[in-house]
Amino acid sequence: MSSVEMKEQENILPHGGELIDRELTGDRKESYLHKSKSLLALKLDAWSLSDLELIANGGFSPLTGFMGEEDYQSVIENVCLKDGTVWSIPITLAVNKEQADSYDIGTSIALFGEDDILYGVLELEEKYTYEKEKEASLVYGTTDAAHPGVKKLYEKGDVYLAGPIFMLNRPSHDNFEKFYYDPKETRKMFAELGWKTIVGFQTRNPVHRAHEYIQKSALESVDGLLLNPLVGETKSDDISAEIRMESYQVILKNYYPENRARLVIYPAAMRYAGPKEAILHAIVRKNYGCTHFIVGRDHAGVGDYYGTYEAQDLISQYEEKLGIQIFKFEHAFFCTKCENMGTEKTCPHGKEFHVHLSGTKVREKLRNGEQLPKEFSRPEVASVLMKGLSKNNTN
């Protein structure tokens, strides 16, 4: 074993104990590419394609494919796979009944993207129906079709296809390729940097001052920060990944020690499942090699569907079984009296001095053409966001 591999062993084990790798190369890839020409095809939407990628690259370890019915029922009802491994979100592949009837159990299905590129193969082991309202209630905590994750669920086909997958071609990530690392690569990077303890931070928003505060608070206790923004499918009113990625680069360059933070994309779709998605986010960062994970206010939430600290409360129940330490932070604010960031734990001043920050407020101000005040955002970040949105609005 090389010195780098030995260092990797000192870091956290993947979820389930083994880092899954279902991405084919060399002769096996060529064999499947040849075989795929005679297979029935299925076109994946962006959401399912990102799931395929994260199963294949190990981000969703220990999953090796789309979930069968036993795992599915166990996940939605008991927050674990059928073998007892903690898992909170069903990773499934839905089709309509007519499509499902065209596929025979035991056959392989060629998986194409909406761009007609062949990305993978599914070895079909199961087909099963499911109750959409039951899944919505148990996973999202609501059956309200106005919830973006529930809306997506209700629009899906009525049958789930299940079985192991192989990825033949990795999806392109356009301008973000230099920030793409799979879990094997992040683990190697952490080892080369000499990081033994790493905190992961999930975001779909630009980094505002509250984010910076909790990231740096966590950095006081660990060797490094993995800033791991989601660049997959999000709501239409979320700030685009292109603008956000530029803002992340700017803030890391100007306000973080170069040897203490790394920017890596998380190529997943956003489910907006709040507490249940917080658990999934922790599992994925564990697979990427993080020893710690930050859960702040209303993690992975949307609207008023979840309580401010509901995600923290739920993930605390599973922290020991998850095998990753959770940093839980209160709602941070800028205190105009302190002239600094703080929380109720560190600031003695009244609410009239507190400027509360959130991704929603940042988005609202930007869309209204308002300059972000220094209490909200670093000026370099504000400039990137204003220019980016202005450019988007004129296109």
Swiss-Prot record:
Pathways per UniProt:
Sulfur metabolism; hydrogen sulfide biosynthesis; sulfite from sulfate: step 1/3
Q: Name one GO molecular function term.
A: ATP binding
GO biological process, any: sulfate assimilation
The record, for InterPro entries, names: ATP-Sase_PUA-like_dom, PUA-like_sf, Rossmann-like_a/b/a_fold, SO4_adenylyltransferase_pro, Sulfurylase_cat_dom, Sulphate_adenylyltransferase
Entry EC no(s): 2.7.7.4
Q: Which residues form a coiled coil?
A: none
Pfam families registered for this protein in UniProt: ATP-sulfurylase, PUA_2
- Which top EC class is named for this enzyme in its record? transferase
Q: Which reaction does it catalyse?
A: sulfate + ATP + H(+) = adenosine 5'-phosphosulfate + diphosphate
Membrane-spanning ranges: none
Instruction: Provide the alphabetized UniProt keywords.
Output: ATP-binding, Nucleotide-binding, Nucleotidyltransferase, Transferase
Q: Which family does it belong to?
A: Belongs to the sulfate adenylyltransferase family.
Q: Which PANTHER family match?
A: PTHR43509, SULFATE ADENYLYLTRANSFERASE
What protein is this chain from? Sulfate adenylyltransferase
